[in-house]
UniProtKB/Swiss-Prot annotation:
Function: NDH-1 shuttles electrons from an unknown electron donor, via FMN and iron-sulfur (Fe-S) centers, to quinones in the respiratory and/or the photosynthetic chain. The immediate electron acceptor for the enzyme in this species is believed to be plastoquinone. Couples the redox reaction to proton translocation, and thus conserves the redox energy in a proton gradient. Cyanobacterial NDH-1 also plays a role in inorganic carbon-concentration.
EC number: 7.1.1.-
Organism per entry: Synechococcus elongatus (strain ATCC 33912 / PCC 7942 / FACHB-805)
GO molecular function list: NAD binding; oxidoreductase activity, acting on NAD(P)H, quinone or similar compound as acceptor; quinone binding
Name this polypeptide is given: NAD(P)H-quinone oxidoreductase subunit H
Subunit structure of this chain's protein: NDH-1 can be composed of about 15 different subunits; different subcomplexes with different compositions have been identified which probably have different functions.
Length: 394
């Protein structure tokens, strides 16, 4: 009896784009042979808003409220790099108290960023319960931000050239220490619930392995780089703000798989708590803003045919003049190296404002990681990268 041969042709599957509040508007064109992934092509750009061009047509004070829309899980990091760029270009010093306040806000944002990564990542691999836990803890961080800045999730508009917009209110530091005490126990609870769970371990161990050489060659940063055994943290390398005043460790893992990246992020939350405790205990007195940096310099005069005269019908507002020159500034966000290349032309607006988003670079390795894996592993690998499409597309 003759048997019919079965031939299977590759199937092309579109994953996404989804709503920005979910996994984001990332579209993956996946080529499948049965359950195996042959090829993957990421399609980006659905959330492009021209942030760099907007920055080149705004003064720094006007642009700071915009920047929370890059990475809407890490608004404080975006504000920090936006004011750090002209600060470094113009050599504007920051008072010690303002630097401590900035560090506290950045580390709170690092915890909030890792929490918002942790919940959806675990939901993707089948653990639904922690997804609800993380919002309970993030709510307390929102309360602290609301007390200090007036806003909760994004658009805090708190960082300024030379300092911060306002000093911390009375009793805020005590509330922050109370949060650290509360959250320390919650991280222990997460680890008991998740880390040694056999189902979770089988879903993420040995999946999406990135070697040390691959991580360096693909220019990865943040937990993606440290999860492959590279001890590289810009808080230690660049010595920005006042991180050298505190005792903390750079967390690494050697395996390079999804589980290693999970462990790095969970342990980084513990290190952030250590930094916040030390900053709250040792914060000095003094001004929260460099008053010399507030000096106003009038911009160029309006021409009758110029766009500012025709459409705004007033002269350019007095504000900081960005001196001529160019500079690259970077910091360690929750996702990796967030950088800005700024080029000034002795005007109130930068001539060039290039944003180096960490998740844009980290996303490049996804097609290589997905080749040969099963369909069920796609979300585990993509989730371990920690991508926010507002930051990728800008």
């Amino acid at each position: 009896m003759a048997l019919l041969e079965t031939r299977t042709e590759p199937m092309v599957l579109n994953m996404g784009p989804h709503h920005p509040s979910m996994h984001g508007v990332l579209r993956l064109i996946v080529t499948l042979d049965g359950e195996n992934v042959i090829d993957c092509e990421p399609v980006i750009g659905y959330l492009h808003r021209g942030m760099e061009k907007i920055a080149e047509n705004r003064s720094n004070v006007m642009f700071v409220p915009y920047v929370s829309r890059w990475d809407y899980a890490a608004g404080m990091f975006n504000e920090a790099i936006t004011v750090n760029a002209p600060e470094k270009l113009a050599n504007i010093p920051v008072p010690k108290r303002a630097s401590y306040i900035r560090v506290i806000m950045l580390e709170l944002n690092r915890i909030a960023n890792h929490l918002l990564w942790l919940g959806p990542f675990l939901a993707d691999v089948g653990a639904q319960t922690p997804f609800f836990y993380i919002f309970r803890e993030r709510e307390l961080i929102y309360d602290l931000w609301e007390a200090a800045t007036g806003q909760r999730l994004i658009n805090n508009n708190y960082f300024r050239i030379g300092g911060v917009a306002a000093d911390l209110p009375y009793g805020w530091l005590e509330k922050c220490i109370d949060f650290c005490d509360y959250f320390q126990a919650k991280v222990d609870e997460y680890e008991r619930l998740i880390t040694d769970n056999p189902i979770f371990r089988r879903r993420v161990e040995g999946i999406g392995v990135i070697s040390r050489e691959e991580a360096l060659n693909w220019s990865l940063s943040g937990p993606m780089l440290r999860g492959s055994g590279v001890k590289w943290d810009l808080r230690r390398v660049d010595h920005y703000e006042c991180y050298d005043d505190f005792d903390w460790d750079v967390i690494t893992a050697e395996e390079g798989d999804c589980f290693a990246r999970y462990r790095v992020r969970v342990q980084e939350m513990r290190e952030s708590l250590k930094i916040i405790r030390q900053a709250c205990a040792g914060i000095p007195g003094g001004p929260y803003e460099n008053l010399e940096a507030r000096r106003m310099a009038e911009g160029k005069k309006s021409e009758w045919y110029g766009p500012d005269y025709q459409y705004v019908s007033k002269k350019v507002a007095p504000t900081f003049k960005i001196p001529a020159g160019e500079h690259y500034v970077r910091l360690e966000s929750g996702k990796g190296e967030l950088g800005v290349f700024i080029q000034g032309a002795d005007d109130i607006c930068p001539w060039r404002f290039k944003i180096r988003a960490p998740d844009f670079n980290n996303l490049q390795i996804l097609p290589q990681l997905l080749q040969g894996v099963k369909v069920a592993d796609i979300m585990a690998i993509l989730g371990s990268i920690d991508v926010i499409m507002g930051s990728v597309d800008r």
